[in-house]
A protein has these predicted regions:
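Hydrophobic or amphipathic, alpha-helical segments that drive membrane association/targeting
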Residues: 2-7, 12, 17-18, 22-117, ...
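Active-site His/Glu-centered metal-binding helix of metallohydrolases
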Residues: 57, 144-156, 219
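Envelope-exposed proteins and targeting segments
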Residues: 73, 100-104, 112, 120-124, ...
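Catalytic Zn2+-binding segment of zinc metalloproteases
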Residues: 135-139, 148-165, 183
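Acidic/histidine metal-binding catalytic segments
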Residues: 160-172, 189-192, 228-238
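Membrane-active amphipathic alpha-helices enriched in small hydrophobic residues
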Residues: 168-183, 192-200
Length: 560
């Protein structure tokens, strides 16, 4: 029988408890049980077992406050990830079994370090620091494409084949290091874990072989090119990281510790970039990326010092192009909202609207004028001089949407009913997830402000969220907002059920079962909503069965 991963993880915990920081109790990591992973004759971790392992890791990670669901940033992340995933499918990099059984789910981590990491089961962690540091959407796609290729090429499972016993210890140490990194957010702790476990890991990442790194580079760059991103993004990112690591050795780049840059990797990326076709600048989302970099910076470090620095930068009258200026204003406004300094936030949003209007006028003027180059004569020789005016590209429509959403955040922060209503109106008929969540937050804000229209807004939010969760039952934030909107309407049973579903979506089955039992108790008191009551009974049975099945898996893991 091959050693079970749970046993090795428990042994690793005992060996590693010396390195746990005081703020994080040792027992918090000693309780990590992992599913059984099959027999010794298996050549590698099966896809089913890989998904089980990934699900168990995510059950430990999701409840941590460092894992955030910011609808605006997450939608931007998915706007890069989804084309990469689709391109990998088209190229045949993802087998039908992988596509069906793996999660293909990225998640955001509130951490200023430049890092992204692939996990078993098709999960991918993305630090806000990576988004903030990426100079373009293409550079961001290069990192995600690289990590996606670690998943599609099954590098974790293949690494375990090389030396089964040692790789299991490595994986156990990896999981402990990952959990300690996310929960303690102390870079020294996971490195101590890595050393003691003899795992080539950094903040939750496997250090893959040079061959696998080269493979992930090549597959990742091909995938990002097929997805419509500029292949030069990977070479540009490598150059940016090379310069940064040379000038700054402050451990802010853990991705480099587990993905060491070599001359060969950089040269290969540059060669592939030269062979690819240049991207149309109109499709590069330059301004939207500037806004999302600023949002990542504001959310990854919410200290007063960091936020006031962003606020001050937005007030500086320095020459910037429109994309940079809009990014700076967006970051300054968001920082002001976080500081509850609403007057500067409103002023910065208004200035951004002026910049957008002026830019649109310039684009329109350019379109009206002849596209032919201006020809003039040289003063001395009379020879013709061709003057080509640089083309000005229209700002992406997503930018106006992002500022409209920011205006809603600012109005909700003020808790002014009329201002909230005016801000929500700027969203128009936007049915995206960020707009849906913003309307729900606005309805809750109206209720807090005792706005007379709050009841109608809450009911509309409940109906919209109920439709959304029917199609997206794993959306924790949507369930949470549904509970918060239903409660003030007196829909107690619906609110309790939504709270339970939020717990279940996070993997907290005990918490979900507890809330559903509270719902059953409420129905026995005579406050009946027969539809919700029947759903609660059914879901309670389902989750109890799921918990029993999970318990059997963990029992098998502990008793090989």
């Amino acid at each position: 029988m091959r050693p079970k991963l749970a046993t090795l993880a428990a042994a690793a915990c005992l060996a590693l408890n010396l390195f746990v920081v005081p703020a994080t109790p040792a027992h918090a990591f000693g309780q990590l049980n992992l599913p059984a992973l099959g027999e010794a004759e298996s050549d590698q971790l099966s896809i089913d077992d890989e998904r089980k392992l990934g699900d168990q890791i995510m059950r430990e990670i999701r409840p941590d406050p460092a894992v955030i669901d910011d609808p605006v940033l997450y939608q931007y992340l998915m706007s890069v990830f989804v084309p990469l995933h689709e391109a990998a499918l088209r190229r045949g990099n993802i087998s039908p079994e992988q596509e069906e059984k793996l999660a293909w789910e990225p998640f955001l981590v509130r951490d200023p370090e430049f890092n992204a990491f692939a996990l078993p089961g098709g999960f991918m962690g993305v630090n806000l620091g990576m988004i903030a540091a990426a100079g373009s959407r293409d550079e961001m796609a290069s990192v995600l494409g690289h990590e996606l290729s670690h998943i599609t090429q099954r590098h974790i499972a293949r690494s375990m084949v090389v030396n089964k016993h040692q790789s299991m210890i490595t994986m156990a140490a990896m999981l402990i290091g990952l959990l300690m990194s996310v929960k303690a957010r102390n870079g020294d702790v996971p490195m101590a874990v890595i050393t003691s476990g003899q795992a080539a890991m950094a903040t939750g990442q496997l250090t893959f072989s040079r061959q696998m790194e080269a493979e992930a580079d090549a597959f990742g760059q091909d995938v990002m090119t097929d997805a419509g991103f500029a292949p030069s993004g990977m070479a540009a990112m490598f150059g940016r990281l090379e310069d940064a690591s040379r000038l700054n050795d402050s451990n802010q780049y853990p991705w480099l510790r587990s993905h060491p840059l070599t001359i060969e990797r950089i040269a290969a990326a540059r060669l592939r970039a030269r062979q690819g076709a240049p991207q149309d600048p109109a499709k590069s989302h330059i301004t939207e990326h500037a806004l999302m970099r600023a949002r990542a910076r504001a959310l990854m470090d919410t200290s007063d010092v960091a936020l006031r620095r962003m606020q001050a930068q937005a007030r500086l009258n320095v020459p910037l192009n429109d994309a940079e200026r809009l990014g700076t204003l967006y970051g300054g406004a968001l920082a002001s909202i976080e500081l509850r300094d609403f007057a500067p936030a409103a002023a910065m949003i208004a200035e951004a609207e002026t910049v957008q209007a002026q830019h649109a006028a310039l684009v329109e003027q350019q379109a009206r004028e002849a596209t032919a180059p201006v020809v003039s004569a040289h003063e001395a020789t009379g020879a013709p001089i061709v003057v080509v005016t640089p083309r000005v590209y229209a700002i992406e429509p997503e930018v106006a949407r992002d500022f409209a959403l920011l205006r809603v955040e600012e109005a909700v922060g003020r808790r002014s009913g009329p201002e909230i209503s005016a801000a929500v109106a700027t969203l128009g008929d936007d049915r995206s997830r960020p707009a849906l969540m913003a309307r729900a937050e606005a309805a809750i804000g109206r209720a807090a402000a005792r706005d007379p229209s709050a009841g109608a807004s809450l009911q509309m939010a409940v109906e919209s969220l109920q439709t959304w969760v029917a199609e997206h039952p794993r959306d924790v934030l949507a369930w949470t907002l549904l509970a918060q909107c239903a409660e003030p309407l007196g829909q107690k049973l619906r609110a309790i059920r939504a709270e339970a579903e939020a717990h279940a979506a996070q993997g907290d089955l005990l918490g979900a079962i507890d809330r559903l039992r509270a719902g059953q108790k409420l129905t026995r008191s005579g406050r009946l909503d027969f539809v919700e009551a029947s759903i609660i009974d059914s879901r309670l049975r389902e989750l109890q069965a799921e918990r029993r099945a999970l318990g059997r898996d963990l029992h098998d893991a502990d008793h090989p």
